[in-house]
């Protein structure tokens, strides 16, 4: 096959490309330039998307004896990832830019160009498995090494994209083995540290970066009863579950720390409360995509006409709302609900409702909820609302924040 290897400049993509070459494929390496001013992206041992990374990727391709190119995706990255990140925070939501990058850049823009140029598949260094079923369908599964599993951030991929995705590290037992293999091959990136932070925030200080990109207005910090506890420099700088940086005027009556429960951009308010009030028992997600063929209950429901209140049969899942969080057992169903974002009266939106058998803490609107059955990724949706048995539901910031959003 003709393979395009996405070269990040790290050890994982280097070994993935090497395995593709050894498998006998025609491999071409490409590094994505995501900024026209690389100095504005993180530099150093924990970064990604830097000039150093580009040079590391070039050296690996030279050692493998394969062609190497740099593709300028900076404008697309700014529009689809950076601008989206800003507008989501403006609306009081907590986005995941790495998932947006996978969805819009690595497995949309990159794959589209690769297919147009005659490539059969794109190879990356992600830790996840793609399985072809007996009936020819493609499924996304967790990697063999659950400690490094990245199926969560790949939950945005569609069935069509999975047809052209290859993850050679899928069955590698550990990251240590990948590094050992890289060292044996003489790759200089064998000991290069992993990158963890957001690549376009140079110093890793999200609040300071947002302050340079969003107009912040001072406002009030309140408890769940509406009592004013303090002031904040801008509601958009806070996220659900946050404890640090609240600067409250006095301690809680019970002496326990307080956490952000809600961000209300329309009112420019931050609502705080005890850790116990962060517990969420039901989540509603929108903009669902399926990583393969939808489960039977959802597939049947999606064939029926949209009708307010209609719902599918329940199906058992495990739900994960953060990249490295433990999944929790749940029951899910699809339903048609009023669309608060639509201008047309009576418009409906499709929602994924997940009832958690064990509560989750600190679920924020805007986060991605990925559903699994066993090791298989069913799909994902963007969290619109979360409900707690202990307090009123977190308001739907996908509509409440619309007046301040740049969408």
Predicted segments, located by residue:
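AMP-forming adenylation/ATP pyrophosphatase catalytic core
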Residues: 11, 123-407
């Amino acid at each position: 096959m003709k393979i395009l290897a996405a070269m990040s400049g790290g050890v994982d993509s280097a070994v993935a490309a090497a395995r593709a070459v050894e498998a006998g494929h025609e491999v071409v390496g490409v590094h994505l330039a995501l900024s026209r001013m690389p100095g504005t992206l993180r530099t150093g041992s924990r970064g990604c998307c830097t000039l150093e990374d580009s040079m590391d990727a070039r050296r690996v391709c030279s050692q493998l004896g394969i062609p190497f190119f740099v593709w300028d995706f900076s404008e697309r990255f700014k529009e689809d990832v950076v601008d989206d990140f800003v507008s989501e925070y403006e609306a009081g939501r907590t986005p995941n830019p790495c998932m947006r990058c996978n969805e819009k850049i690595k497995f949309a823009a990159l794959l589209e160009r690769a297919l147009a140029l005659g490539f059969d598949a794109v190879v990356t260094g992600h830790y996840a498995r793609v399985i072809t079923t007996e009936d020819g369908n493609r499924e996304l599964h967790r990697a063999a090494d659950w400690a490094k599993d990245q199926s969560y951030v790949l939950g945005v991929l569609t069935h069509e994209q999975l047809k052209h995705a290859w993850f050679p590290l899928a069955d590698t037992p550990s990251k240590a083995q990948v590094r050992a293999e890289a060292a044996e091959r003489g790759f200089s990136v064998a000991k290069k540290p992993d990158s963890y932070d957001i690549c376009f925030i140079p110093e890793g200080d999200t609040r300071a970066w947002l302050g340079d990109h969003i107009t912040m207005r001072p406002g009030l910090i309140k408890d769940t009863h509406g009592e004013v506890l303090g002031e904040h420099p801008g509601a958009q700088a806070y996220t659900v579950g946050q404890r640090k940086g609240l600067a409250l005027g006095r301690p809680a009556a019970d002496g326990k720390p307080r956490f952000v429960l809600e961000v209300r951009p329309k009112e420019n308010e931050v609502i705080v409360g005890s850790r116990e009030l962060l517990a969420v028992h039901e989540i509603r997600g929108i903009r669902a995509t399926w990583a393969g063929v939808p489960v039977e209950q959802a597939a049947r429901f999606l064939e029926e006409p949209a009708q307010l209140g209609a719902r599918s049969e329940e199906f058992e899942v495990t739900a994960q709302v953060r990249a490295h969080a433990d999944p929790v057992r749940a029951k899910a169903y699809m339903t048609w609900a009023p669309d608060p974002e639509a201008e047309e009266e009576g418009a409906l939106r499709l929602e994924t409702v997940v009832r958690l058998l064990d509560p989750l803490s600190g679920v924020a609107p805007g986060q991605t909820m990925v559903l699994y059955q066993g090791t298989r990724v069913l799909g994902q949706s963007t969290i619109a609302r979360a409900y707690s048995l202990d307090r009123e539901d977190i308001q739907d910031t996908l509509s409440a924040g619309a007046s301040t959003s740049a969408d």
